[in-house]
């Protein structure tokens, strides 16, 4: 079955809140020997991007969007448990990941950090809604190897940019690797470099 058809089947089940139907799509993939490390980036991620894109363009209702994202989160959580059940060799690289301060949508970030953890990174993930001064304090206190900031909402860009600028200005963690991701950065080529990440 093609990836597009599979994504469409899962999408339809999700936006209709069809929990058994969504689980059936995943169970069929597992029966074919496809594990969570493939399902997450190759099925969950494109389905999530489709849901998010249609919602931003007002092509699906808020109800359908909520049904879809809540159910997809359940499926992602279940798959994440499978990912860490057979841990990868540790890379001795510590990642602190967060979403923007007003970011309520964390599902894409959650998938990314689940995959990082499954691939040997030590990950801490605060999600969204955390003020940037608290993120800065944690980074300065714990000195992670990587600060990974997700942003799908344009209103969070100024806060993330300010955080990055402040970390550079105060010389906090000179070896800190700054990484940004999420919808805003996917839609605006060169934005990550422009803000210093």
Q: What is the meaning of each model-derived region?
A:
Residues 117, 130-193:
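Cofactor-cradling patches in redox/metallo enzymes
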Residues 1-88:
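Long amphipathic alpha-helical segments
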Residues 99-103:
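Residue-level signal for short, function-critical loop segments
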Residues 81, 106-110:
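Cytosolic, long alpha-helical scaffolding segments
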Residues 110-124:
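Short helix-loop-beta junction
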Residues 122-132:
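A short glycine-rich beta-strand->turn/loop micro-motif centered on a GG-aromatic cluster
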Residues 35, 122, 145:
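Residue-level detector of anion-binding/catalytic polar loops
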Residues 88-95:
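A short, charged/proline- and glycine-enriched loop
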